[in-house]
């Protein structure tokens, strides 16, 4: 592999990792806010879809330039195409993380059954965060067996988030049936948690 090409690949990987770190940081702040029951601190999540999209476009341009200049072979071509997909997914995840923080903060109130909500929201967020961290760590992995193990770990965590969301959805629907006056607030909480489940 040509040295300039290898350098370009490392730069692209580094930029993608930085987007991932920004999204992970936002999710960690959200987790800390929920664990400490300081929901107002969710407003401190400073990740924006616009900034992520700009960064993603820069990475996409780097990838396209690399494709044009170096005409990579099949394996390297697949790697570059996967980088395009990864940046797109990280932007989507970052957007969902920001939407979660914004919607959860807006709809969370002491009128709701906060202990039940947090009982499921915290593990849901923790599982989504672990899945994202593991996914990002795969970028630097070169051992095929370790990649496979991490991939399976991601699948397990995503399955956990699905299960936790279904459990909280069922419990919130029960709460709504008992207290129709708060149905909008509960649905808003559910909507915010749905964003988290999609991270």
Task: Please place each PLM-identified region on the residue numbering.
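Cytosolic, long alpha-helical scaffolding segments
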Residues: 1-199
């Amino acid at each position: 592999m040509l040295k300039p090409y290898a350098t370009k690949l490392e730069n692209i990987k580094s930029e993608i990792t930085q987007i991932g770190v920004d999204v992970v940081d936002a999710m960690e702040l959200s987790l800390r806010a929920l664990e400490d029951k300081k929901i107002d601190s969710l407003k401190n999540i400073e990740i924006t879809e616009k900034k992520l999209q700009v960064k993603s476009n820069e990475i996409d341009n780097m990838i396209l330039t690399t494709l044009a200049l170096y005409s990579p072979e099949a394996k390297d071509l697949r790697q570059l195409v996967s980088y395009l997909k990864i940046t797109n997914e990280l932007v989507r995840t970052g957007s969902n993380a920001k939407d979660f923080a914004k919607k959860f903060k807006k709809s969370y109130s002491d009128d709701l059954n906060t202990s039940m909500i947090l009982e499921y929201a915290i593990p849901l967020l923790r599982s989504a965060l672990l899945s994202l961290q593991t996914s990002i760590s795969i970028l630097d992995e070169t051992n095929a067996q370790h990649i496979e193990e991490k991939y399976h770990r991601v699948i397990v965590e995503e399955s956990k988030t699905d299960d936790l969301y279904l459990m909280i959805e069922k419990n919130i629907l029960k709460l709504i049936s008992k207290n129709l006056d708060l149905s909008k607030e509960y649905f808003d909480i559910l909507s915010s948690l749905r964003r988290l489940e999609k991270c």
